[in-house]
């Protein structure tokens, strides 16, 4: 007998300021917000494709990553996009740069990653690491 997984259902991450996180995930990244059950704590849910979600939870202890920059070896989740080029252009239009002095606006790009698919890494406002990847390099 095996676990027999269907898919990754959701990832939950701690956030310290829900309004700021909603602006980042909803307004900036353009993820559609989902209806969230009436829990006794604040949060927001976002769709990341069919039957997959990102759950933001306001958590007093925040994140373990305070003061850290973008590090692909740290805890992170990945969003697969259709076009690496389009994602890179979108992030640059939002102000992300590889040489940004502000960690929150710095992106780390790895178009020919050892993993076998192109990757971009950024931080959310609470310094949670987000990987954005594509099936292939389309630069």
Model features per residue range: what roles?
Residues 113-116, 133-139:
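Short beta->alpha transition motifs characteristic of CBS
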Residues 1-19, 74-79, 135-139:
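N-terminal beta-strand motif that seeds the catalytic metal site of vicinal oxygen chelate
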Residues 40, 73, 116:
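Exposed loop/turn and edge beta-strand positions of beta-sandwich/beta-sheet ligand-binding modules
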Residues 14-53:
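Core segments of cupin and vicinal oxygen chelate
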Residues 32-38, 101-103, 109, 134:
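Conserved catalytic-core motifs of GNAT/GCN5-like acyltransferases
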Residues 16-19, 77-126:
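Vicinal oxygen chelate
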Residues 56, 63-80:
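Helix-adjacent hinge/juxtasegments
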């Amino acid at each position: 007998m095996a676990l027999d997984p269907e898919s990754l259902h959701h990832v939950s991450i701690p956030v310290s300021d829900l309004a700021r996180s909603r602006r980042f995930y909803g307004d900036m990244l353009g993820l559609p917000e989902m209806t969230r059950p009436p829990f006794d704590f604040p949060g927001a849910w976002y769709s990341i494709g069919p039957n997959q979600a990102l759950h933001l939870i306001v958590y007093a202890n925040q994140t373990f990553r305070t003061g850290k920059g973008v590090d692909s070896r740290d805890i992170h989740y990945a969003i697969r996009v259709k076009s690496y080029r389009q994602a890179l252009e979108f992030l640059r239009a939002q102000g992300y740069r590889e040489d940004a002095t502000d960690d929150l606006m710095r992106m780390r790009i790895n178009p020919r990653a050892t993993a076998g698919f192109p990757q971009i890494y950024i931080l959310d406002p609470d310094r949670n690491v987000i990987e954005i990847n594509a099936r292939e390099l389309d630069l």
